[in-house]
Amino acid sequence: SFSWPNGVKVINQCSFSIVKPGLWMLVGENGSGKSTLFRLISGAIRPKSGKIYCSFRPSMVYQNPDHQLLMPTCKSELMLSIPKNIPHSKLFDLIQSSLEKVELGEMLDRPIHTLSGGQKQRLALAGAIVSNSNLLLLDEPTALLDPQSQNSVLKVVKKLTSSSADPITAIWITHRLEELFFCDGAAIVKNGRIGEWNSGSKVFQELKSLALR
């Protein structure tokens, strides 16, 4: 559970687990606690009661990539995220590999300000990869993107979570219900609690039926 200093309870005895890699989506109304839950998982804030057990190395990706991309080029941006124990001789290969995984392999020296919104979001994903993160916390990563860029980000994340060699786990907050059809499981967040995990299509139909009432 978690409450803000003013006493407003945002997370209320929330309990859930993710047992395997994949793309898992959360949906819910504004103020239901989704983003606060991400901050708890990432360690940015601590729960007021209860515990969080996370064996993953989490990394946040936000709605607007401009808020987290700080350097002038793709290469210099990824240099910020590389763990300090990586030998200098391996830096280039690690950066290039991360860019290729998000389909930006030709963008090493590309100025970030020339990238499209979808490319910037994929660069943010590359930053998570190069940091050796294996848990992506994606807070509405396609909310500001056009349909083509939205699909490009979904495609990359789906590929990362279903890789046979080294799949990662992604938890994705969405308000775009059509995205639910891409996930391995989805749940509705309401009043600070997560409901049961179901297929994305089942959650989609449940939300559609609620909207028609």
Model-based region annotation:
Residues 111-115, 119:
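Conserved ABC ATPase signature
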Residues 27-29:
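The feature captures the beta-strand-to-loop junction immediately N-terminal to the Walker
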Residues 193-213:
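Conserved beta-strand-loop-alpha-helix hinge in the C-terminal portion
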Residues 125:
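Hydrophobic anchor residue at the start of the ABC signature
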Residues 42:
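Helix-to-loop junction immediately C-terminal to a conserved catalytic motif
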Residues 136-140:
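Catalytic Walker B motif of ABC-type/P-loop ATPase nucleotide-binding domains
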Residues 89-107:
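Conserved ABC ATPase "signature" region
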